[in-house]
Amino acid sequence: MTDRTEAVKAYLLDLQDRICAALEAEDGQALFREDAWQRPAGGGGRTRVIENGALIEKGGVNFSHVFGDSLPPSASAHRPELAGRGFQALGVSLVIHPENPYVPTSHANVRFFSAEKEGEEPVWWFGGGFDLTPYYANEEDCRYWHQVAFDACAPFGAEVYPRFKAWCDRYFHLKHRGEPRGIGGLFFDDLNEWDFDTCFAFMRAIGDAYIQAYLPIVQRRKLTPFGEREREFQAFRRGRYVEFNLVFDRGTLFGLQSGGRTESILMSLPPMVRWGYDWKPEPGSEEARLTEYFLTDRDWLSGA
């Protein structure tokens, strides 16, 4: 393992520790259970899962470092010149599903790839981002989430936030439904256009911004009263989350195709989901407003 890979690994392990500690403190009841695992083909990871807490119904914060002799199809399909190279893949990926429907689901991921071939320089890139999936959305929360994203990107250039915000809107889109998964955030992949140190610094900025973006929203909404109606709508909308993760998500596809650990890969799925045939919310309801107003690709910072 190169010095660069060692530095990335050390950061990711520390990031996992810090995020888990912050979420445990906010929940105040449940603790993460750690499951260290090994991948027979090379590598392993630390899966941490929290369930049935005062705040978090189910959540997972996963670190993985896997390696192998050839990249799986999901990683080389859009870069055929890398086919046949060995690889190192490191990342932290997390999804938090709160019980209260007024607290959004959040997702974050930061990762590093290095495609290697003897006698040649490694081809490396970073990826990651974070995005928010509300059920009963609030404009204040949407603006705040995107403001933290904007601030994290600002030191790296004025064009970075709008570019990666738009990429997030495109990526987290359910093509078969014609709607976004949530209100977006940031998404980037194949990042190697800057030098290594700058790209690594950007990945750290995004990883470090997640707790700053999410916890204030949690704190504002976690005591909002809710009932059976809100829980049923939350379960219905969680179905969209499942559809995206199993059909479109590149991380899920890479993990399954590379022989990753299935329990860790699928830890992002919510615990309770429902599908209703051709179900539609009542016109003018808060449930209808989610799709009519919030689930659109809009500039949340304009006029903010």
Swiss-Prot record:
Entry EC no(s): 1.3.3.3
Principal subcellular localisation of the protein: cytoplasm
Sites where the protein binds substrate: S93, N109, V110, R111, G259, G260, R261
Active site: H107 (proton donor)
UniProt keyword list: Cytoplasm, Heme biosynthesis, Metal-binding, Oxidoreductase, Porphyrin biosynthesis
GO-annotated molecular function: coproporphyrinogen oxidase activity; metal ion binding; protein homodimerization activity
Pfam families: Coprogen_oxidas (PF01218)
Pathways involved: Porphyrin-containing compound metabolism; protoporphyrin-IX biosynthesis; protoporphyrinogen-IX from coproporphyrinogen-III (O2 route): step 1/1
Reaction it catalyzes: coproporphyrinogen III + O2 + 2 H(+) = protoporphyrinogen IX + 2 CO2 + 2 H2O
Site (Important for dimerization): H176
Record flagged with keyword Cell cycle: no
Compartments (UniProt record): Cytoplasm
InterPro entries documented for this protein: Coprogen_oxidase_aer (IPR001260), Coprogen_oxidase_aer_sf (IPR036406), Coprogen_oxidase_CS (IPR018375)
Gene Ontology CC terms, in alphabetical order: cytoplasm
TM helices/strands, residue ranges: none
Entry cofactors: a divalent metal cation
Function of the molecule: Involved in the heme biosynthesis. Catalyzes the aerobic oxidative decarboxylation of propionate groups of rings A and B of coproporphyrinogen-III to yield the vinyl groups in protoporphyrinogen-IX.
Family: Belongs to the aerobic coproporphyrinogen-III oxidase family.
Subunit structure: Homodimer.
NCBIfam families in the record: PRK05330.1 (NF003727)
HAMAP family reported for this sequence: Coprogen_oxidas
Name used for this protein in its record: Oxygen-dependent coproporphyrinogen-III oxidase
Lineage: Bacteria, Pseudomonadati, Pseudomonadota, Gammaproteobacteria, Pseudomonadales
Name of the gene: hemF
